[in-house]
């Protein structure tokens, strides 16, 4: 398996208080020392990928220059979760006062300008670039467009993000690691005709409770980008959160992840 790692989510009640009160009190938040421990843990677990914390309560990973150096020192490949295009933490980094609305129909140029800057800043490091277009902080994009227009808008956004990568990374865009996670409403858009370049890895999500919502079909199994898995072992959201107890049986994890692995999630 080429990339295996974790997404630090819902850090509000665990990692942020611990880091700010006991481990990095001088910073008062998650910082380079905390990420060094996370990266060390990943290596001990034979993992090599990290999507950093992204709630507004914590300082964005890319707002602290040292954190990128920490990840690079540990040879950890950095990425971002399903709603963060091209390593941009929209939940805490997007400022509507200075950047305009987070709306692709109304502010396409402004959004792509910020994404371009992020790719330029992070291109010296090893990354998996998420291609995405959702609302701010894990919500659907605010729009009343019919489904065929949602497909069109997302299709254009992904093409623009590919163009940004091609123009700012000195290698063929087909060789730049890219991932697309059809999570929540995006899965419906994908199922209604969204087309992806063959080299993009499709990261299939579970239903937030440990059951895979979709696996690669015959056509998708032939894609050079193969597929991956976005799998929850805790969840904050509707209809029911579970954060404190390990309620997903290991046997279920094995069964679901094995099905995904057998259909090119490798």
Give residue spans per PLM region.
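Short helix/loop capping segments that flank catalytic or ligand/cofactor-binding pockets
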Residues: 15-18, 61, 88-89, 140-141, ...
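Glycine-rich, aromatic-flanked loop segments that form ligand/cofactor-binding clefts
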Residues: 1-15, 72-90, 201-205, 209-210, ...
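Structured mid-domain segments that build the active-site/substrate or prosthetic-cofactor binding neighborhood
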Residues: 43, 48-52, 58, 66, ...
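An acidic-aromatic substrate-binding cleft motif
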Residues: 1-27, 33-53, 225-228
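Gly/Pro-rich turn-and-neighbor structural signature
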Residues: 55, 62, 70-73, 97-224, ...
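Catalytic domains of carbohydrate-active enzymes, especially glycoside hydrolases
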Residues: 27-56, 63-66, 70-81, 124, ...
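Short, glycine/acidic-rich beta->alpha junctions
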Residues: 30-34, 58-63, 182-186, 247-253
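Glycine- and acidic
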Residues: 15-25, 47-53, 97-101, 136-148, ...
């Amino acid at each position: 398996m080429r990339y295996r790692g974790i997404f630090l989510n819902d850090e509000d009640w665990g990692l942020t208080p611990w880091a700010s009160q006991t481990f990095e009190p001088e910073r008062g938040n998650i910082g380079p020392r905390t990420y060094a421990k996370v990266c060390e843990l990943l290596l001990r677990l034979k993992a090599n990928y990290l999507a950093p914390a992204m709630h507004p309560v914590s300082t964005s990973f890319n707002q602290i220059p040292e954190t990128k150096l920490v990840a690079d020192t540990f040879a950890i490949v950095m990425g971002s979760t399903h709603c963060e295009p091209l390593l941009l933490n929209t939940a805490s980094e997007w400022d509507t006062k200075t950047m305009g609305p987070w709306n692709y129909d109304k502010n396409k140029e402004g959004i792509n300008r910020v994404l371009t800057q992020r790719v330029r800043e992070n291109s010296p490091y090893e990354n998996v670039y998420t291609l995405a277009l959702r609302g701010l902080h894990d919500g659907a994009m605010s729009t009343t467009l019919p489904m065929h227009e949602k497909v069109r808008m997302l299709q254009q956004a992904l093409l623009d993000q590919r163009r940004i990568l091609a123009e700012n990374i000195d290698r063929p865009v087909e060789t730049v690691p890219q991932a697309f996670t059809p999570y929540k409403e995006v899965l419906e858009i994908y199922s209604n005709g969204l087309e992806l370049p063959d080299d993009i890895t499709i990261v299939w999500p579970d239903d937030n409770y440990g059951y895979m919502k979709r696996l690669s079909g015959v056509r998708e199994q032939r894609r050079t980008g193969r597929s991956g898995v976005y799998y929850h072992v805790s969840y904050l959201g509707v209809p029911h959160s579970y954060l404190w107890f390990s309620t997903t049986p290991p046997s279920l994890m094995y069964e679901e992840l094995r099905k995904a692995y057998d259909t090119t999630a490798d």
